[in-house]
Design a protein with these regions (language model features):
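Active-site-proximal beta-strand elements of phosphoester/diester hydrolases
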Residues: 1-9, 98-110, 142
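Conserved beta strand-loop-helix elements of the APE1-like EEP
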Residues: 60-75, 193, 204-225
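Structured beta-strand-rich core segments of catalytic domains in phosphoester-bond hydrolases
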Residues: 37, 42-109
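Active-site beta-strand/loop signature of hydrolases that rely on acidic residues for catalysis
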Residues: 7, 23-41, 101, 130-151, ...
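N-terminal, active-site-proximal structural segment of metallo-dependent hydrolase catalytic domains
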Residues: 1-47, 51, 57, 62, ...
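Active-site beta-strand termini and strand-to-loop segments that position acidic
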Residues: 70, 94-97, 220-221, 239, ...
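Surface-exposed cleft-lining segments at the edges of enzyme active sites
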Residues: 81-82, 107-123, 158-162
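Metal-dependent phosphoesterases centered on the DNase I-like endonuclease/exonuclease/phosphatase
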Residues: 30, 51, 122-210, 214
């Protein structure tokens, strides 16, 4: 089973940069996107052979998640069941017979870390949600998790210690999630590879490859041995992120 996850930084904008061609070329069984920045029906994209599921933020033009699936899930859940966290279209869960697929766009702590305190409460609530699912069947988490976990996951570690996405607090929450029974699939398959999934539009970061690895596939430990590939598609353009891939034998 091949899965793709991609923060498209606005689906309507990405569609003008060959998203449809990239979607077809990647040929995923489940294709998840984050930061759709739209309400249902606002994008002219209906790939043949797929069923679409979307979850939009209440605030128009902001956040949002979506999935396209070759095989329809048993059930679809929006949000994590916590009122304070379920207004921004951030978590879309698909239940299949043998696993849950959780598509997530984690809140950014923002410039000046204005939203770091909220981010910490989100992290705890989201981890609890994943553990509730994991108690029933294995979990595959994908998405833009807005954290570079370790120094190998970011080009300029020293100068970003207080930047949103690389604070000690955010990194510790990722460590806590993995310690709760989950595996970062790219790092498991490529323990020493330096590869990034996001580049700021500022400071000529793409030209310098001054990137961050903040897009993930994370799986329950008990299915980690089923992973056969975990890749980052740096050759695919259209957003400030690139797609990430998981192939798993489930």
């Amino acid at each position: 089973m091949k899965l793709i996850s991609w923060n498209v930084n606005g689906l309507r904008a990405c569609l003008t940069h060959d998203f449809a061609a990239s979607f077809a070329a990647l040929d995923a069984d489940i294709f998840s996107v984050q930061e759709t920045k739209m309400q249902p029906g606002q994008a002219d994209f209906a790939p043949e052979g797929y069923t679409e599921y979307t979850y939009s933020a209440e605030k128009k033009g902001y956040s949002g998640t979506a999935c396209w699936c070759k095989t329809a899930p048993l059930a679809v859940t929006t949000g994590i069941g916590r009122e304070e966290h379920d207004h921004e279209g951030r978590v879309l869960t698909l239940e299949y017979p043998g696993f849950y697929l959780v598509n997530c766009y984690t809140p950014n702590s923002q410039d000046g870390l204005k939203r770091l305190d909220y981010r910490m409460t989100w992290e705890d609530a989201f981890r609890a949600y994943l553990l509730e699912l994991d108690a029933k069947k294995p979990v595959i988490l994908c998405g833009d998790l807005n954290v570079a976990h370790t120094e190998i996951d970011i080009k300029n570690a020293k100068t970003n210690r207080m930047s949103a996405g690389f604070t000690d607090q955010e990194r510790a929450k990722m460590t806590e999630l993995l310690a709760a029974g989950f595996t970062d699939t790219f790092r498991a398959v490529h323990p020493d590879e330096v590869k990034y999934s996001w580049w700021s539009y500022r400071f000529h970061a793409p030209e310098k490859n001054a990137g961050w690895r903040i897009d993930y596939f994370i799986v329950s430990n008990r299915i980690a041995d089923k992973v056969t590939a975990a890749e980052i598609h740096n050759e695919v353009f259209g957003s400030d992120h690139c797609p990430v891939e998981l192939v798993i034998d489930l």
